[in-house]
Every structure is written in structure tokens, then in C-alpha cells.
Swiss-Prot record:
UniProt-recorded Gene Ontology molecular function terms: hydrolase activity, hydrolyzing O-glycosyl compounds; metal ion binding
Coiled coil stretches, renumbered: none
pH dependence statement: Optimum pH is 7.0. Stable at pH 6.0 and about 80% of the enzyme activity remained between pH 7.0 and pH 8.0.
Active-site residue list: 327 (nucleophile), 356 (proton donor)
Species assigned in the record: Bacillus subtilis
Cofactor needs: Ca(2+)
Protein's recorded name: Intracellular maltogenic amylase
Family: Belongs to the glycosyl hydrolase 13 family. BbmA subfamily.
Amino acid sequence: MEYAAIHHQPFSTDAYSYDGRTVHIKIRTKKGDADHIRFIWGDPYEYNDGKWSANEQPMRKIAATEMHDYWFAEVVPPFRRLQYAFVVTDDHEDIFFGSSGVCPYNEKTLETIHYYFKFPFVHEADTFQAPEWVKSTVWYQIFPERFANGREDLSPKNALPWGSKDPGVNDFFGGDLQGIVDKLDYLEDLGVNGIYLTPIFSAPSNHKYDTLDYFSIDPHFGDPEIFRTLVSQLHQRGMRIMLDAVFNHIGSASPQWQDVVKNGDQSRYKDWFHIHSFPVTDDNYDRFAFTADMPKLNTANPEVQKYLLDIALYWIREFDIDGWRLDVANEVDHVFWKTFRQAVSTEKPDVYILGEIWHSAEPWLRGDEFHAAMNYPFTEPMIEYFADQTISASRMAHRVNAHLMNGMKQANEVMFNLLDSHDTKRLLTRCRNDEKKARALLAFMFAQTGSPCIYYGTEIGLDGENDPLCRKCMVWEKEKQNQDMLQFMKRLIALRKQENTLLTEGHLEWNLLDDKNDFISFSRTLDEKILIYFFNQGNVVQHISLRELNIDRNNKICDAWTEQPLHYHDVIAVQPGEFLILSAAAPV
């Protein structure tokens, strides 16, 4: 047994409160090393005849990566206190693993209390809690300047005719909030029930990430009344809205920064920024990346903190928005985000807080900052397998597993899953315009735990390279839309909403990872219901014999996509590039 590979970290994603009563426990071992693991646990104060009273239960292997296996146990401590350890078994030995590491498995070890891990008390206040509604939300991201032009009188004077050319960095086409209101029937018919808008606040650019005034809507987008109408109509339709907050930096044309430029070290705003010396030049202050027109805010400054918190609360109080997406969230200090979380959650307990983080976001997802992150590390291996074809099926699955194991279950359940955005190539372009690959990728992502998001235009076959080409004008002429893709997305969204509880909370198990033939199968299981997915990315037809699957022959089986009933003895062909979803449930 490889002792050095055994890992468990208390008070982390390895040991946490799931719901204020239930504790989730994970331990990692070398892949293929352990035959089974027993979880020893009990209340630290409970003794019988002078000996600590311990319970014992088997752990379940729930995931594997290229190098490790992950094991899981779930317990409900009667008095919300927990003392625990592990007994790891292979072909040759049993070992005890606890707070002192690996120890011999014997009576003396079992009776040495300080060898055990402790979970002193399961506090609800310490439990990661996210808004329940996010679990059933399918998001639709809108870049307002390119979605729809509802009021041409608001368009910038230099606005180009809608969709007349591929967008340049500084082009305007006149998209606005009225355009979004006008298309709500379309969005409702598509099936999405959450709208994420990139920034709508006053700013000189088309993207609005260079904010002038966070309290006002950009005049080319509309005014407070049309935004109020948008929020109201969304809520009437059972839909949510999330705004984009740029709190890492501000626009260089903002009054605060211009005051610093004018008055130097005499400016009342000089400590709002990270300025190295005066007077301000193009290279003596911190900014977003190396972008001169986006000076970085000093969020350790109490005045800046109050300013930003007032903004966050204003849009909740005045317009009842449902969430904040936080731009460049990983470059803002944790202290501020903890204060932000407390303030906005007190104002609206079910507000959704989403951070833009492109790497592992675990430090921000401990229950006192964000509910979720934009889940690029989770979906990137999917894209690399299906679209880029640069990794194998097993490599993809291992990376997906590793990412899931790095998070708490309740955090994974509300993560923001996306395949493209205003910052990336569009999905169809990443797939080299192979529509089958794009469909397979979407179906694969929609089968995973988390809250899925599609970028405007994906549903009608919009393509585009990296920024600015990924920000094309939405196509509204039906004859120019890919209607087959649109119908596909409607069905995919409907299926996700229909099976939402299973796809959010159900167990993921990889049934087959055939690297040679590029054929994948996995299942999502919850209670008596199971969905089994098959993806054929190879060049050969694959045949599925239902009787060879792990399905009770008395179960009701159907093709989940077409809802066509199937029979236990059926054999189904999965063509190259296609996928199949089977549904099986115990008869009612």
C-alpha cells in the first residue's frame, strides 16, 4: 500500500457539513491500492465501560482519476459532534489512518483517542448554503449591445446597421434593454429561466467593463424604467436575472480616476487605487491586466468598500435583481468578498453570487464568499475531448472527476457550467463548425451537476472566433437561423428541466471509457431512477444491448430524448457522432 498517497484534510472539501446535520467525508488513496475502507466514527464524549463507543460503516468508492481513488461516507451525528478515522485495507494489510497519519491497526491504536480526526460541532452557520432556485435554472447569457435593437433612437450615432459586418473591437450596433424585453417570448419558448447580462452600467465601450457610473444604466441601453420593466416581466414568467459587477477595476473616464489624474496626490480619491507615484502616467499604477483604461480599485480602502457595497445593495433594493456575477473576482481580496457576501445575503437571502474565476475556485467556495464560479476548469476537458480531440475519453473523465472531488457537493450543485462566453471562441467555432460535435458537447454538459448556461446565439448556430468575433449580432431572421439546432436546444433544455433533480443531485458513474473507439457511457442515478448516456465520437457504429446493462428487467425503459418505450431485449445502434440517452425507473 502506498501510504504517501493516502490523503484526508479535515475542515475542508474532505470533511464538511452538507445541510447542517449531515456530514460528508472523503478520503483519497492511490488508484487501485485499497480493496475497501471502513469509516470509524462516533461522538467524542460517548463511552461505554470506559471505552469510546464507535460506529463502523463501509465507504463507497465514488470516483477515480489517473492516479487516485476517492472514497465517500455520509453520517448524521446524533449530537452533531464527530470523532473519526479510517481503516484502509488491501491484499496484504489493514492500516489505521487518522490525525497522526498511518498507524498500525490494533487495539492500542483504536483506543488512542488523539489519533482520531475531530469535527467538533456541525453548525448550520458554518454550512455552505446556496439559493435553492439555482439548481433548477438554465441560464442564457446576453451581451446587450449585440442581442437586439429595440429602440434605434438610443443607438450611438456611429452605430452600424445590425449585423452588417463582423464586429470590430470598437464597433457599436445598437443593442439595448428594450430589445431584450421584446424577445422575452422567444427566451421563454426556448425554455431558459435565468438571464445573465454582461454590464449595463454607463461606460464608453460596447462591452461596458470600463465603468463610468455604477448607479446609472448606459443611455444607449435604456433607463431605469425599462430595466424595471425587464426585471418585472422576467419575474412574472418565473425567470431570474443576474447582473455583472466590475469591482476589480473602474473605467479611466470615471470621475474618481479623472480627479486623480487632475489633482494627483491632492485628490480625495488617490487612495482608491494602487498608484505607485505621482503624477499618474501610463505605467505607474495597477490596472486590469495591462489595460490602461481600467485602473484597479483598492478594495482594502473603507471608502471604496462602502462605495461598492452601496452599488450591490442598490440594484437589489431598487430593482430586485436575483444575482451578481463578479468580474475578475479572483484578483479582489478575500476580506472584501466576505463583507460583500454578508451584506447582499442579508439584504436578499436567496441572491446568487457568482465569481469569474478561470482556475480552481475552492478558496472562494467555503460558504462565506461565493456560491459558485464560472466553471471553465470543469468544462474545458469536455471541450478538449469532443471539440479539440486533444485528450482521450479516460483523460477527460479523470479531469472531470478530479474537479468534482475538489468541491463540496452543494457547491458543485450550483456551479455555473458553460462551454463558451463573451471571452472565448464560440462553441460551433471551437468544434470547427461540426454541428454534431457541438450538439454532443451540449448534451454532455447538460448531463452534469451544476447550473448550465448557453451563450446567446448558440441555439441558432452562431459562430465566432475569439473577442471581438464571439460578440456578433444575434440573427433574428428565421431563414438565416439554424432551425434544427434551435429545436435541438429546446428539447435539451426541456429534458434538463424535466430531470433536474436527478441531474443535480444524482451520482455520476462512468460505465465505459473506450479510448480506442472513442465511445463513452456514464450514468446519473438517484433513488430508483437512472439515466444512462452513450456518446459515440468514433467512426464505427456501436450497438447497445439493453439486457447487458445494469437495469432491472422489470424497470420501465425508454429513449429519454424521444420518449419512445424500449424493451429489455432491444439492441440499439449509436451512429458515429451521435448520442443516446436511456431512462430507466422502477414501475409505479
